[in-house]
Amino acid sequence: MQIRFYRSSDREALQSYHLTDLRFTSHPIQAVADLENRYAILGLVEHQIVTFLILDAGEKKFTYGGQPESLLLRSFSTDEDFQMRGYGSQTLKLLPDFIREYLPMYKSIILGVNERNQVASYLYRETGFSKQPQRILGPAGWQEVYELKI
């Protein structure tokens, strides 16, 4: 598995990204519509997009207790055709080295997870993220805040 930055030439492939449960995330096509201060990242296996996420360098990170050198992880998902194969955790484990190489000015990743999304909370804890004391009221309810130092 590898991760890399999204390119406009990937748009067609994202059209066929299967994601029907949008309770806790947005579809990648929606997410790439606004990339100001954001980096779209793809997880690929044999040139097939299996995961997607946004690293947001904008002001929203401060809502979650982020610092100027933090990135807010948003819109993280695994294509439904590839779920339960470990690609989500592999993507998260590859992120720190990717950021050190391509975005070295950032020193942590911060994110919010809806309290009802226990699968995601477990995934973040298992991949090295630390639960922070604050909670945020997000669009779909209360969110736990997690951070990973890079």
Please place each PLM-identified region on the residue numbering:
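Extreme N-terminal starter segment of soluble prokaryotic enzymes
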Residues: 1-2
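Acetyl-CoA-dependent GNAT
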Residues: 5-75, 79-81, 92, 98, ...
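Short hydrophobic/aromatic beta-strand or adjacent loop that forms the aromatic wall/cage
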Residues: 38, 141-146
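Solvent-exposed beta-strand sheet faces enriched in polar/charged residues
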Residues: 56, 110-112, 132
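Conserved beta-strand-loop-alpha-helix junction that forms the acyl-donor binding cleft
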Residues: 105-121, 137-142
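Short aromatic/hydrophobic contact patches that present stacked aromatics
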Residues: 75-77, 110-112, 147
